[in-house]
Amino acid sequence: MAPTVLVVDDEASARAFIERALTQEGYQVLVAAEGEVALNILRSTKRKVALVITDLVMPGMGGHAFALEVGKLPSPPPVLYISAYEAPRGEMSKRFLQKPFSVAALSQAVARLIPQEVKAK
């Protein structure tokens, strides 16, 4: 079965772009418009989520606060941060894509962050 990616972004056009690109790459994609909904998906889905992609700036729970909550889950998936604003510094910058980004850049980032053993299943 293809790896599952959860996409969290308050912009419908961004969610649709990422969902379409990842589906064409063969991934299963779940989407949410806000952090609280995404946490509910992570807690309730039967699928093993291999990667979470989250916008950093969203109404309500922002991407960083959401990622901290994801980290508290059993076996948390890696998180890829996206934003149209300035790139974060430090460790987070290694898992960041500046909007707008190309399908190729998204594909490379996703492939880098999903563990090899997940891709092999």
What are these regions (language model features)?
Residues 16-24:
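Charged docking surfaces used in two-component/phosphorelay signaling
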Residues 31-51:
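Acidic, metal-coordinating helix/loop segments flanking the phosphotransfer/catalytic sites
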Residues 34-37, 61-66:
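Acidic catalytic/metal-coordinating carboxylates
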Residues 43-47, 69-76, 85-89:
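Conserved phosphotransfer cores of two-component systems
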Residues 55:
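Active-site residues of response regulator receiver
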Residues 58:
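Receiver (REC) domain active-site loop signature in two-component systems and cognate sites
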Residues 99:
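A Lys-centered signature of the CheY-like receiver
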